[in-house]
């Protein structure tokens, strides 16, 4: 008698994706982040669902409803902080996942990579709209500043912004629609993640060497299931430590002040995971130029497969490219730091230099380094 796992239409899909899936024998812990992102997404959807049961998306009561969740709902404080810090963990895993893809040449799987870029945009949009919902000072002014950027689009800009706002400023209509979009987007993200996996399983996983691993495959279960469980335990440990010991570490104190359209906070800044893009936006004195740089700073990921000039896929055996990769990582950390600083000397010039370096590394230096390495190997 055949196993139900291999015959049942639904079980067969699960079996071929998570149990009998042939996986390379040498993938390192850098390949754990896909499953961790799945765990983060499930956690965010579940905690978000319970928060939505008690939240009201009206400007008069939104802030109070969040306070009510934290004070009066059973374990409401835990659900709220798991959701807020879960977003930070989500982005940490995302950045590491993308970084892994860049380092080991996973972007050569074009369909998987492009869906991944769309996923990144979708998660960023979701996080931005979620930050607006508590209706604190930083929620309101963050929404005002970021949506206002669209007014830089020639001819249709102003109309577009007012259409998104549902009025002439960020108000009740804006909050209500942001709540609606914030609720629906994670389910769209889950569907896209399914497509992401579908495309990945067409080709099979990449591995650290960047070479074909068809000759040396092992079953996903038990080898990588147990490995993913270890990753999940570490994720849960870090998240629970953050939530239970310093839940407000990554938040902005200004968001504990109810939104006031008449009082602008001294330093408007987004959550830490957007600071690098915010620094790039601010480093260009022109509004439209800044917006284009902001969008292109993420969209540039879609160009990376076309900028691959090396004859090797992975950076494992390419020391010059490795140096440039880690320079890029350091540059992104500098941009993150600058994004949280006020707009004054010397932060302005540091931000501008870091922004120039960011684009130069990806568009010019890394492709040239790859060509140089090809010549060093006399290929």
Swiss-Prot record:
It is found in: Mitochondrion inner membrane. GO terms for cellular component: mitochondrial inner membrane; respiratory chain complex III. The keyword Electron transport applies. Keywords: Electron transport, Heme, Iron, Membrane, Metal-binding, Mitochondrion, Mitochondrion inner membrane, Respiratory chain, Transmembrane, Transmembrane helix, Transport, Ubiquinone. Its main location: mitochondrion. GO terms for biological process: mitochondrial electron transport, ubiquinol to cytochrome c. Gene3D superfamilies: Cytochrome Bc1 Complex, Chain C. It comes from the Eukaryota. A ubiquinone binds at residue 201. It is a multi-pass membrane protein. Its cofactor is heme b. One of its GO terms (molecular function) is metal ion binding. Heme b b562 binds at residues 83, 182. Heme b b566 binds at residues 97, 196. Belongs to the cytochrome b family. Heme 1 (or BL or b562) is low-potential and absorbs at about 562 nm, and heme 2 (or BH or b566) is high-potential and absorbs at about 566 nm. Component of the ubiquinol-cytochrome c reductase complex (complex III or cytochrome b-c1 complex) that is part of the mitochondrial respiratory chain. The b-c1 complex mediates electron transfer from ubiquinol to cytochrome c. Contributes to the generation of a proton gradient across the mitochondrial membrane that is then used for ATP synthesis. This is Cytochrome b. It comes from Mogera insularis (Insular mole). The gene is MT-CYB.
